[in-house]
């Protein structure tokens, strides 16, 4: 009824969800880093999003992968997308604190067995 007569949509493909054990070193590292920063973390058994994470987490590769980050932003890939550069609220990380969070994550990753 509506739209363009010369456009045809073919649905196909797709990929499995990204699933990682909460006992993996990667997830333990993420949780430890958030705890050190005093940030509350939420674990989701599956990651949604626009990346084929199962390419890495499913056989035959089977390595953990996940999303990590501190700081605040919203509106990803939209005209009103933003990321907080400098925060006046000590409970909300800006760019510098987010960068330090990544550095701490890498140190934690090296330390956690």
Task: Place the predicted regions along the sequence by residue.
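Short alpha-helix boundary/capping motifs
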Residues: 7, 58, 84-85
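Acidic-enriched catalytic cores of C-N bond-cleaving enzymes acting on peptides and small amides
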Residues: 1-6
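Preference for short coil/turn "hinge" residues that link or interrupt alpha-helices
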Residues: 11-13, 40, 75-76
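Active-site-adjacent substrate-binding region
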Residues: 18-69
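His/Asp/Glu-rich mid-to-C-terminal helical/loop segments that flank catalytic regions of hydrolases
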Residues: 32, 70-113
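Short proline/glycine- and acidic-rich turn/helix-capping motifs at secondary-structure junctions
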Residues: 8-21
């Amino acid at each position: 009824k509506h739209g363009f007569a010369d456009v045809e949509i073919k649905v196909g493909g797709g990929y499995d969800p990204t699933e990682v054990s909460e006992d993996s070193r990667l997830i333990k590292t993420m949780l430890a880093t958030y705890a050190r920063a005093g940030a509350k973390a939420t674990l989701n058994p599956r990651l949604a999003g626009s990346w084929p994470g199962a390419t890495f987490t499913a056989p035959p590769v089977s390595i953990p992968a996940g999303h990590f980050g501190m700081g605040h932003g919203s509106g990803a890939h939209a005209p009103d997308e933003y990321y907080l550069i400098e925060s006046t609220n000590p409970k909300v990380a800006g760019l510098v604190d987010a960068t330090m969070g990544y550095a701490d994550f890498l140190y934690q990753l090296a330390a956690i067995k």
